[in-house]
Amino acid sequence: MDDVRINTAGFVIREKYLSAMEAFIDQPVVKVLKGMRRVGKSVLMRLLIGRLIDKGVPGANILYINKESLEFDALKDYLDLYRYARDYFQGGGGVGKKYILIDEIQEIASWERAVASFLADGLGDVVISGSNARLLSSELATLISGRYVEIPVYPLTFREFLTFRHPRTQENIATATATATATDAPGQTNASASTASTSTSTATDTDAEFSNYLKYGGLPGIHQLPVEDEVIFIYLNSILNTVLYKDVITRHKIRDASIFDMLVRYLFDNVGNITTAKKIADYFKSQRIRTSVDTILNYINYIEASLLIDKAPRYDIKGKRRLEFSDKVFLNDIGLRHGLIGYRESDINGLLENVVFKELQARG
């Protein structure tokens, strides 16, 4: 079970991921955080830096690069990255082990060459993050095969969602229960009744929060916003647009954005349903839109690579044989769906199936 707690600075710590990162610190492998945009990879890196400093690592021995910051906009390719890291440590690094942490590394052209050189030259222990599945597998596998570990980072599970929403809830419940146990004497029921009332109230609150979870999803950033549909859905839709246009349309040079947009809406509207490329192409044809099955397949692969969706393959039960192009599509974060097409209670079956799929995935 996930271990989520609050640190002294008030941040919610997702201990499962931090522990996975720490297990490989000072080992000769690249630590790769893989997850969709805004899932919390940057916060995990900052928390890891905090733990390194707590263990006595000088701040000068830690280089943190976030490619979403204009501060590092000049780092365009692998040579820029390598020279920047080399000069940083030559100019002021302290004695001892060095650490290089790079966020959204896919924004640096041929970055894998710099990472391979960091390893070869012993420049520092490397932790990277990225939000594109293809970049973080094929390119890494080519240059540093056997010298990296992938740590997938998922949106919040429901348990994590509760912790973000009510950081002290579990602590308060434990305190109430302990107080009831200590003050209850034989024949006295006031404390027990109080505990029962607390439990009933908590169950009611949990039901309400699960409804919020189904509607808003598990991206950590929503917990900095008012719990209002209009506000949260605008935020989620802005994230979705960034992913679609920056990570998919621009990167893959998609020419017909209108067909691509329709495909995204179709996939989001059919979460949990068995989907085939031919079925989608036939639907488009019924709407007087001409496109090919191959185009649909390519677009779905691009969307999957951006980590917006997961495909659950269907198998022939008798022969354990995978049936081609007959998958169920699930969303990495269900809230993004509602930012795009709105929330409908009539879709509850697919939404619940999506939540269960992601919970099982997060548990490994």
Name what the model sees in each region.
Residues 61, 228-364:
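Accessory nucleic acid-recognition modules appended to NTPase machines
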Residues 131-133, 138-274, 307:
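Interdomain motor-coupling "hinge/lid" segment immediately C-terminal to the ATP-binding subdomain
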Residues 41:
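Conserved lysine of the Walker
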Residues 44:
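Hydrophobic positions on the alpha1 helix immediately C-terminal to the Walker A/P-loop
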Residues 8-25:
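Pre-Walker A adenine-sensing motif
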Residues 33:
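Hydrophobic anchor at the beta1->P-loop junction of P-loop NTPases
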Residues 54-69:
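Conserved catalytic segments around the Walker B and adjacent sensor/switch elements
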